[in-house]
């Protein structure tokens, strides 16, 4: 778990259940795009109603998991054993992209060797950065599947997906399983 407390970055990922609407939000609005992993739990803002957040911190993927209507607190899942919850889906990341898994969470020491969007796109190495993608591909994870979202198509009006480039703003998954900004 070395490197957990350095090179923080938010990753646009979803934990979802069919029929529900989840939200990705900036977990620390005072430090746009960043989060302090040393804090174990955080009270859900009243405007968020216990929805789900997934973040990446340094070389490890940490998920803050909360089920809408079940809890008002998110708990850090810092290891495989710490993240086996009967009613949760968790996210696991590999060097070649996102993978959705049932009731399991993993961290990898070999991921995030560069800017996350470059890593997902073609494996280039670069300094760590909160990268606001332009013509890079994001992955929308829902219902245990991964759908590629081509941001350049969205910009040209050729895609049904919508994407808010400012990761510091709220991103929601609407009931039709596409990105929408709130």
What are these regions (language model features)?
Residues 1-127:
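Short, compositionally biased
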Residues 101-131, 135-182:
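An exposed tryptophan-centered "aromatic clamp" motif
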């Amino acid at each position: 778990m070395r490197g957990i407390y350095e090179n923080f970055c938010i990753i646009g990922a979803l934990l979802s259940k069919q029929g529900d609407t989840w939200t990705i939000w900036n977990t620390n609005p005072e430090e746009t795009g960043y989060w302090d992993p040393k804090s174990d739990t955080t009270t859900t803002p009243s405007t968020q109603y216990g929805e789900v957040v997934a973040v990446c911190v340094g070389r490890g993927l940490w998920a803050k998991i909360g089920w809408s209507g079940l809890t008002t607190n998110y708990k850090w899942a810092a290891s495989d054993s710490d993240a086996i919850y009967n009613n949760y889906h968790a996210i696991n990341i590999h060097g070649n992209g996102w993978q959705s898994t049932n009731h399991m969470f993993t961290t990898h020491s070999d991921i995030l060797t560069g800017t996350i969007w470059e890593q997902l796109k073609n494996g280039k190495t670069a300094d760590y950065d909160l990268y606001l993608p332009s013509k890079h591909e994001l992955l929308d994870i829902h219902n245990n599947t991964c759908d590629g979202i081509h941001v350049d198509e969205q910009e040209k009006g050729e895609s049904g997906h919508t994407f808010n480039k400012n990761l510091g703003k709220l991103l929601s998954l609407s009931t039709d399983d596409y990105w929408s900004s709130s």
